[in-house]
């Protein structure tokens, strides 16, 4: 019975997790894309290393998501187990995992363990293919304990190749994804999200961001802790530290807006909600943006109209629209909206009293200050955000599918460059590879791969891709890659020639001009 209940809950969460898949994976929808990574088994015999149990799925989930998969979140997993009275450390046997898989709405389950080997660590994992009820052979990664993140990055790459044999992103790109994260900061983060005591959680999370000030997940977790403790100014500051490139950026923006609302920073709250709404204009975001606008004495009616249209069955949106309409002189429409609110929630005593007052002979002349404030939506519906993101992804996938192979490759390469410019190398390489698959003669795709290879330290492959791009057509990025590689190898004549070619293509290129300046400084020659 317990296995069945876990399965049914995960069935629900699995559907939400689908929305995290990238639109470029539309052709692979339903093909080993929805994943559940269970905490790894601690086979070290050392309690001090128990934190790695949760570290494993944290790293794997991040790499899988960047690779186009849809891993279920830690929160979803914990929610399911908690509501069934099962411990967070729930670790099914192989037989138990197979039974669980029979009714799960996931495509793959990752189970694994880790052990020490001298001063090193060995991580091992298997993939349970749910549709086939087949467990893969074990894959393994090992390394020094100080390189723990790289060990699990390497393991993630091997597991990805099992789930998608055609996956062509280089292992070096996986390793580069976690290269800038300090292990001590990551450990503090994992301890911070795992501790039972709230003060201990905050202590670890504060230490994490102190050690690694750009570590978004730790800022997000710290913001949550401050928000739950009603420390709204501190929460707003923490949420603001989450990078726009972070997968949780929209959620951080929503809760930052709430935090700002709660301590009266209404213009900043409005801006925060507006930034989220530009990406995902969901009802709760539009409503709260309208509240922030109204609290400044401005007209939020348009936003409340959008919110009530987006979710017409939510009474609070009709309540807020009624208040706004009344404040701006539309009495009849205000009463209609308040009536609709009461149809949806008949026992809303505040709305009942307000409707009775408004219908009285002098009701519409009542002092606005005596009326209730607009209602704030205080919860972030992650499922709704995922579903909305999924709809947008599906629309984009449909648009891509309608293009010719060349047009699709151009679009994918353009999006890949956006990822690259934001430092998201794994996502960038995946889309560049997809572009090459669609059109192997697209010079920009090969040039992009050259840039990724250069960034990950694979100079031979970077040079190969850059030269391949130039055989198709001259591109600025290809000449820049070759110029940087030859300058690093002290081949200054070659570097000078290559940067000269880059400047012929784009005389205004700042990158080319800077490289020219560096070459001149090192050689003492003006080009």
Features from the language model and the residues they span:
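A structural "domain/chain start" motif
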Residues: 19-69, 181, 185, 213-216
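Alpha-helical segment of the N-proximal tetratricopeptide repeat
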Residues: 182-217, 221-230, 258, 262, ...
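Register position in tetratricopeptide repeats
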Residues: 197, 228-229, 262-263, 295-296, ...
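Start-of-helix register in tetratricopeptide repeats
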Residues: 186, 217, 251, 284-285, ...
